[in-house]
Amino acid sequence: KWSPNLPASNSLITDAHNKGFKILLSVLGNPADISGGANFDSYATFVGELARLGADGIEVWNEMNIDREWPAGQINPTTYTDLLRRSYTQIKSKNPNTLVISGAPAPTGAEGAFGLDHVWNDNRYIAGMASAGAGNYLDCVGVHYNEGIISPTQSTGDPRDSYYTRYYPGMVNTYFSAFGSAKKLCFTELGYLSGEGYPALPSNFGWAGSTSVAEQAQWLAEAVGIARSSGIVRLLIVFNIDFTTFTDDPQGGYAMIRPDSSCPACDTLHTVTGGR
């Protein structure tokens, strides 16, 4: 996590490389620290240093279309594109091989309920980024998909409604077309929530109440298979592997490794990736 004047550290990067992994860093900070465009250059310098230290990929901020992650009243894709431009310039000047991923917006249709001071629908936000020229300052478009309750092979049939964020194809088509089909997608979070093995899901996550662990495992494998064969998804990170928190934000319900230590998704993903 960045904060003004914080020096970049290579500890995570070195540790990952020593273990034979590449490392993608999603770099965010406190919304108050960027209010009014303050400290954009400080942030850009920080991510540039991470690139110099060997980061293989950097996601520039996170879910900047909601006021939990960006200052309320200032949510604007043009403003974010300015931060992205400065960051991209610094990153590429320090390490041209570092993959630059735009921050993935929160999938949402809530702007009508809460107002644009607090949230922008992600389709509007992504379109605004494209109009502001963000495509010139990214290697890959960041995407989050975390509210599915049906197979990613389906583009209809969600019992809630037909809103595009419900569907894997809806998210892919929306984000890919926003940049004129010219930029590949990077899923920095893709997961399916199952409360199986836990107490009841919090009420605001009740939409996933009927999703089983077996369905989670099947759908993750299907999503990876579709992404690999599509030619338009460069990277996909499963959210998540082994989180255990299960409070008002039930991250443990997204975990592949379940409370009983079983991991059905490990087996399905092993099959679809050919053992990699």
Regions found by a protein language model. Name each.
Residues 1-77, 105-107, 155-163, 247-258:
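N-terminal substrate-binding region of glycoside hydrolase catalytic domains
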Residues 5, 11-17, 139-204, 224-237, ...:
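Glycoside hydrolase catalytic-domain groove-lining segments
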Residues 7, 64, 75, 197, ...:
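Aromatic-rich peripheral "rim/lid" segments of glycoside hydrolase catalytic domains that contact
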Residues 114-135, 164-185, 206-210, 215, ...:
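Short flexible/disordered coil segments
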Residues 70-74, 110-121, 152-163, 198-211:
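Short, flexible/disordered intra-domain loops and linkers
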Residues 82-126, 167-168, 172, 176-196, ...:
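Aromatic-lined carbohydrate-recognition surfaces of secreted/lumenal glycan-active proteins
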Residues 17, 35-63, 73-94, 117-139, ...:
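An active-site-proximal structural segment forming one wall of the substrate-binding cleft
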Residues 46-77, 98-109, 136-152, 185-190, ...:
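Active-site groove signature of glycoside hydrolases
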